[in-house]
């Protein structure tokens, strides 16, 4: 029981509110402390954008909604829409998959059990099905 228990929630500067809201619903007193910021790294993404354009990437894997947001920020305006074929996207879980879908992109893999082991298993299963189709 967490009613009136003080909980220190250490998180990103712009966090998902699910945990905080869940704790507050059961009466916990939340102290929020942001300790890091999710922002795109300043590097040259030209190589990867070219890989996307030339359909040389089999999958794009996202492990968090902030990764999706930051990826979207590095894309030049209209880039995704200009791709000849949309790349396959895999997400660690349903919240990350929702972030992908919010941009209008399709998700091909998002395991029900949200951990890396099941994500890899999902990718292997999907790739096996694709291989069988083309044999």
What are the language-model segments listed below?
Residues 1-135:
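Conserved beta-alpha
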